[in-house]
Design a protein with these regions (language model features):
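A short beta-strand-loop-beta hairpin characteristic of the jelly-roll/cupin
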Residues: 236-255
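A short hydrophobic beta-strand segment most commonly corresponding to one strand
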Residues: 229-235, 260, 275-290
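Short beta-strand His + acidic residue motifs that chelate non-heme Fe in jelly-roll/DSBH
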Residues: 219-222, 243-245, 261, 267-273
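Fe(II)/2-oxoglutarate oxygenase catalytic core
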Residues: 25, 29-209, 213-226, 239-242, ...
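Conserved metal-binding segment of the jelly-roll/cupin
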Residues: 252-266
Length: 293
């Protein structure tokens, strides 16, 4: 590492003898990585700073060259993401379920509404569902319990919103059991849920709820349990300043427009508005999984 760092600060020595500017950059990167891993004596710090400057200049030159080469081409999302990954502007996010991984599934953060024929009929019921939501909230201000709760049967979850009603839930199906009191007073919700291919797994699913996020609340980045499902949000109350990031992509909720995403990919959500956000949240089978599987 020291030998590379002793090169001409401009990179000229390495440029001439080790493969040009790109070669120089690789040597400087190697020296910087070695210094970061094992440390470097104080007298080398000025040279390491100059090496960092050289690498930064080289990276900007490469980016300018690349962007000039592809300028004028159609703006294709996958090309844009690939370019951002290459330039270090974006991180690579893959499925990392915390409990169960099913192999061979596409690495997709979001799915589009148009891919599912049941989505449009459910979206058409948004008005009736919002009316039920408003009625419940007016009648029972404390109807929503904290989404993340401490259980005497499990270790306390490591979540800053544990037992905090700023992220609230009102369940219609929980752990595979219908919550009759809520289902009975919200027939539009139950009719809408009947349209979707919701998993039926004893003790686990169906799972469906109104998910409430109060103003100023941030759900920290995390991964879901499984990659065999998609999480669906039917947005009901959607103030400005609210968004959902899944992997490298961030989308906003729009009332009556479904969001479908793979929650085994790192995701987070926030409400930076002064009003409450509410979605109807449920899960469906991944469409790539065969019935036999």
């Amino acid at each position: 590492g020291e030998g590379a760092a002793r090169a001409e600060p401009s990179g000229g020595m390495i440029d001439r003898g080790r493969g040009g500017a790109r070669g120089a950059t690789s040597w400087y990167r190697s020296a910087l990585a070695q210094a970061a891993a094992t440390g470097a004596p104080p007298q080398l710090q000025p040279l390491l700073h100059k090496a960092q400057d050289y690498v930064a200049r080289s990276s900007r030159t490469f980016e300018d060259h690349l962007m000039d080469a592809i300028s004028g081409l159609p703006a294709l999302p996958r090309i844009q993401l690939a370019t951002d990954l290459l330039l270090g502007k974006q991180s690579l996010f893959l499925q990392q379920p915390s409990m169960f991984y099913f192999p061979g599934l596409p690495q997709r953060a979001f799915y589009e509404r148009s891919e599912f024929d049941w989505v449009a009929p459910m979206e058409a019921m948004t008005g009736a569902i919002v009316a039920e939501l408003e009625q419940v909230r007016a009648q029972e201000a404390a109807a929503f319990a904290p989404y993340v709760q401490t259980s005497p049967l499990r270790p306390a979850p490591n979540n800053p919103l544990r037992d905090d009603d700023r992220w609230g839930a009102l369940y219609f199906w929980q752990n595979g059991e219908q919550v009759a009191a809520n289902a009975d007073r919200c027939p539009a919700v139950m009719a809408a849920l009947a349209l979707a291919p919701i998993p039926v797994i004893a003790g686990r699913s169906p799972m469906a709820l109104w998910s409430l996020l109060k103003p100023g609340t941030h759900i920290q980045p995390h991964h879901g349990l499984l990659n065999t499902r998609l999480i669906c949000h039917l947005p009901l109350l959607t103030p400005d300043g609210c968004a959902l990031r899944v992997g490298a992509e961030t989308r906003t909720w729009r009332t009556g427009e479904m969001l479908l995403f793979d929650d085994s990919i790192e995701h987070e959500a926030w409400n930076r508005s002064s009003d409450t956000r509410v979605v109807l949240l449920f899960e469906i089978w991944r469409p790539e999984i065969e019935a036999e599987e």
